[in-house]
Amino acid sequence: MFSHLNQNTSGRHNSMDLNNSSISNFGTPVEQSTPALLFGKRKATVPSSYTASPLNTASAPCSDIFAVSAPAVPQHLKDTPGSKSVHWSPSLVQSGEKSAAQTQNTPANLSFGGNSSFSAPTKPAPQSIQTSSFGGQAMHAPPLRSLRDKVEPAKKISRRNTFTARSTPLSTPITQRVTSRLAEAEEQPMEEEADAADTWVTVFGFQPSQVSILLNLFSRHGEVVSHQTPSKGNFIHMRYSCVTHAQQAISRNGTLLDQDTFIGVVQCTNKDVINGSASGIVARSSNIAAAANRSASMYNSFVENDMADQSVNHNENSVLNSSNVFDANNSLNSSRISVRSGVGMRPLAADQRTNILQGTPSVRKAPDGLLNKFWNTIGLN
């Protein structure tokens, strides 16, 4: 009975040792096992009963308690380090020429050391298919756009191209001129209203008898187009031809008209006067005509003075040519620079010219030397 019990106990121990060895070796790669050469002759001390056991085969998990036999390992698995190695099927490594249905059924071999391995279905690797700009597939084709180009949907691009194609014939110089004139016509009324409000000024603080003096004074700043004087009051509304003249008139605010009157100038705020609907607005057309006549008379006076100067110069030249007066300017060589060309230089014959123009002949002064007195005494001089 005891022998039977010992056999059962030894069998249990052997099974436990087998399980422990299989568990300890499960998931351990061959490369990380302890080599036998580090333990010297311990391998020879192993009992023959253990080495002769049926577990000491090539399919066993281990052939020694200290060393693990090297099973046949494929060549593509020898370069995968780590405690757990995952090997993908070679069909996945190949170029993506197979269909997606074949790649979905490709198993993946997972090896955890030794012979314990299983296969599991894997998902297909995403294939990189290059799409051309025309919507088709371009396999192994060069890129058709730069990385900096803005990618837009095809519908948006076609819509934009259609819009530009339709709008291109309209962008002609004639249409541009028409649109610019329309824009100017729309802006002109608003600008005229703003200008009309800015060109009106109101002057106050004077006596009714000083209206003419006031108009003459403020006409110096610019052209007064019209004015409006109320029947009762000490103010007057005046309109200038431009905003700049009105601003200059407003700058005269608080000035002294005479010894007893201070005047003030502000911008006009009466809407009836600005719109031109107020009564008593007098247009100063007579002043405009007078100003035009004054400018014409000034122009005529300038022309007459210029013609008079030209006639004086002509007479002067004729007198100089007819007389025997020595002209230093005419005696010079024509190739040289004339004395008259010098700016600010007085000509040499200036005294002779002034004498001729004044009508007094030039008289030579007799020298006061001793020889000249002798000649005068003899009468030769």
From Swiss-Prot:
One of its GO terms (molecular function) is structural constituent of nuclear pore. The keyword Cell division applies. Pfam families: RRM_Nup35. Its main location: nucleus. InterPro entries: Nucleotide-bd_a/b_plait_sf (IPR012677), RBD_domain_sf (IPR035979), RRM_NUP35_dom (IPR007846). Residues 1-26, 77-149 are annotated as: Disordered. Residues 82-135 have a biased composition (Polar residues). It is found in: Nucleus, Nuclear pore complex; Nucleus membrane. GO terms for cellular component: nuclear envelope; nuclear membrane; nuclear pore; nuclear pore central transport channel; nuclear pore nuclear basket. Residues 195-275 form the RRM Nup35-type domain. Keywords: Cell cycle, Cell division, Membrane, Mitosis, mRNA transport, Nuclear pore complex, Nucleus, Protein transport, Translocation, Transport. Disruption phenotype: RNAi-mediated knockdown results in embryonic lethality. Reduces nuclear import and diameter of pronuclei prior to pseudocleavage regression. Embryos show an abnormal distribution of nuclear pore complexes and patchy nuclear envelope assembly. Also causes severe defects in mitosis due to abnormal chromosome organization on the mitotic spindle during anaphase. Two-cell embryos appear to lack nuclei and pronuclei. Disulfide bonds: none annotated. One of its GO terms (biological process) is regulation of exit from mitosis. Belongs to the Nup35 family. Functions as a component of the nuclear pore complex (NPC). NPC components, collectively referred to as nucleoporins (NUPs), can play the role of both NPC structural components and of docking or interaction partners for transiently associated nuclear transport factors. Thereby required for nuclear import. Required for the proper organization of chromosomes on the mitotic spindle during anaphase. This is Nucleoporin NUP35. It comes from Caenorhabditis elegans.
